Amino acid sequence: MSEETTVRPERTERSERPERPQYRGNGPRKRRPFQRRKVCRFCADKDLVIDYKDPRVLRSFITERGKIVPRRISGNCSKHQREITEAIKRARNIALIPIASTHVVA
């Protein structure tokens, strides 16, 4: 077999390259609004207790469709999010809160 060598064009320095636009979208660039750091309400208020028998508190951590709100949205710390999840599951098991709030027709 004969070995062929391919000749690559020389790379240009970065300063010689044409500048690319930083934003490659179609419309104007949108800035994200400033979002405050979410604080776990259970860490902030030590008197507030997670109890599976209190559906009023648990409903604020459930969506309209009956799903548990994730930690990044609710702002809970991991310890309290686990406790809330466990309390919601217990309350669902004994029918204090519905598993799905309404029947969803696809």
UniProtKB/Swiss-Prot annotation:
Residues 1-22 have a biased composition (Basic and acidic residues). One of its GO terms (molecular function) is structural constituent of ribosome. The keyword Ribosomal protein applies. SUPFAM superfamilies: Ribosomal protein S18 (SSF46911). Keywords: Ribonucleoprotein, Ribosomal protein, RNA-binding, rRNA-binding. GO terms for cellular component: cytosolic small ribosomal subunit. Gene3D superfamilies: Ribosomal protein S18. Residues 1-34 are annotated as: Disordered. Disulfide bonds: none annotated. Belongs to the bacterial ribosomal protein bS18 family. Part of the 30S ribosomal subunit. Forms a tight heterodimer with protein bS6. Binds as a heterodimer with protein bS6 to the central domain of the 16S rRNA, where it helps stabilize the platform of the 30S subunit. This is Small ribosomal subunit protein bS18. It comes from Geobacter metallireducens (strain ATCC 53774 / DSM 7210 / GS-15).
